[in-house]
Amino acid sequence: MSIRNSIAENIVSVLENATDPQFVFVTRAPIDPQQLSNAQYPCVYVETLDESREDDTMGVAGGTTQRQSILNVGVNCYVKTSPEMMDITRNDVIERVEEVLDADRTRGGVAWDTQLTTVTVNNDVESTIGLVQLNIQVLYKYTTGEA
C-alpha cells in the first residue's frame, strides 16, 4: 500500500473510533448528503488532495534519494441539526477531529507530523445540514530508487 493510502486509511480508522461526537459514517467515497438517513450523521468523507514533494538528501551510492512530502488530506464533515444549533455542532466536530488526529501525529508511524491547517465552513447545503471542510497537512519522508 502506498504511503498516501496508509495515511488516508489511518485517518479513516481514527475517526471511526472517535467519540463525543461519534462519527456514524466515515468513508473515502464521496458522500451525497441528500441520500443519507438522519441516523447516518455526523458523517465524514476523507480524500487525499494535492501534495508537494522535494529532495531531502542528494542521491547517494546505489541511486537512492530521501524525499520529503507534504500531503494535503481533505476531511469533509457533515452534520445534521437545527439551524439554531448548526454553528455549535460544527464547532464541536472541528474540535473533535483535531483532538483525535493530534493523538498520533505520526499516522501510525508512517508520517513525521500531522496538522489541521484550514477550516472552511460551507453554507451551500440545506439549512439543517452543515458541512465543514478541514485541510489536514501530513509531512512524511520516503526513499526513491530502492530496488
Labelled PLM ranges:
Residues 1-38, 48-147:
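Charged, amphipathic alpha-helical segments and their flanking helix caps
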Residues 42-46:
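A short glycine-rich, His/Asp/Glu-containing loop-to-beta-strand
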